Amino acid sequence: MSAKTIMIQGATSDAGKSALATGLCRLLARRGVKVAPFKPQNMALNSAVTADGGEIGRSQAVQAQACGVEPHTDMNPVLLKPNSHTGSQVIIQGRAIGNMEARGYHGYKPVAMKAVLASHARLAAQYQCIVAEGAGSPAEINLRDGDIANMGFAEAVDCPVILVADIERGGVFAHLAGTLALLSESERARVVGLVINRFRGDPSLLKTGVDWLERHTGKPVLGVLPYLYDLHLEAEDSMGLDKPGGAVGGGDKLRVAAPAAPRVSNHTDFDPLRLHPQVEFTLVRAGQAIPPADLIVLPGSKNVLADLAWLRAQGWDEALRRHLRYGGKVLGICGGLQMLGKKLHDPDGLEGEPGSGDGLGWLDMETTLAPEKRLTRMRGRLTLGDAEAAGYEIHMGVSQGPALARPAVRFDDGSADGARSEDDQIFATYLHGVFDEPAACQAILRWAGLKEPEALDYPALREANIDKLADMLERHLDLEPIRRWLPETR
């Protein structure tokens, strides 16, 4: 079997590449095509653990679900996790190989490209179709040399490209026409269709613009996709937090606040809280005060010591101290757990400069970062009401100390995780996705003060949203002009 590959590229970041790829994966799977997702290179702080014990971007895990297959490290062979303004942890085929500054990584790209092509070849041997997703824009002039994320990959595997742009941002015709104008002749030739995303209103009002675009570019517009209200899919990368924030909900609800430090990771952990009908969720940003809350969640971090210093500079440590003094609850996840201990040690400089620092000191434990990253999926039960829990661990920290004698989770394999404070105000765990299971989410909300929490089935909600995307594409995306680049469907 040798798969056909079709690639989704965007005229800008956040144009809708991930959503279009996800919907197309489900649409093809519905039609009996054995399909897999692929993203050559991803820069993301939201990641997922695969069945083969590696790490990929969160969007590729969701796209694998859309395909009805298990996520695999070959689906995102290069993952960059920013840990400073100029550097990232580099993950190749699911495994961290070290930290690199941007200039150093540029020289490493030929090696990364070999991994990209090897992963693609393995998937191509197993599937009928690969839906690949680009990163950012293919027309970034300063990134064209040695590109492995967009047209560099498309040229290497000789695949067609669909170019998508977001009309919600304005300037959609300039984005599409301008992107095509900046491509080389061979790159422009492999663009087989254009998509206008997130249009509100009557699409007939756009007809003159679409007609002009097709005449000007010589490319068919495959669809004008409507704005989907109440569509909830996990954000792909660190840019997800740059969207407008603030409180969600109100009235007689549990108040949950989450301080967002610069290197917050896996903030998809918050999604079930954002969507829960009985939760008023507030993402607290730089310069803002932590509002009155029943529960404060300290999320994961790609640089715990740096984010903890930043948290203190915001005065949030004092706000947390007051919150606990007046009976509030605090939940730490992964890096948040490490912050709650007495000491943090990074002797090898795995996340930043080598060194040690004081934690917040509310749990009697210390954490040392070690080169071997723990990547695993786990199932078990919370020590809160024996509620069933499931999720994944992604961390380099090894935590030790008396606080761990009161664990937060007991896993099915007999191991334990995390800590609960003796006064039961603090719950800390390495388990990402701890709110995803309905019973676990209910137990935590009850512990935080909500008397009768409703069950929110977040995995079922994700599945319904994938179907919602595919249903929309069935109605609004014309695949006929690109039929020859797709496998036969039933």
From Swiss-Prot:
Active site per the UniProt annotation: C334 (nucleophile), H432
Keywords per UniProt: Cobalamin biosynthesis, Glutamine amidotransferase
Any Pfam family hit: CbiA
Recorded metabolic or biological pathway in which this protein acts: Cofactor biosynthesis; adenosylcobalamin biosynthesis
Residue ranges occupied by any GATase cobBQ-type domain in the UniProt entry: 253-440
Superkingdom classification of source: Bacteria
GO MF term list: ABC-type vitamin B12 transporter activity; catalytic activity
GO biological process entries: cobalamin biosynthetic process
Keyword check for Membrane: no
HAMAP family cross-referenced by the UniProt entry: CobQ (MF_00028)
Entry function: Catalyzes amidations at positions B, D, E, and G on adenosylcobyrinic A,C-diamide. NH(2) groups are provided by glutamine, and one molecule of ATP is hydrogenolyzed for each amidation.
Family membership: Belongs to the CobB/CobQ family. CobQ subfamily.
UniProt protein name: Cobyric acid synthase
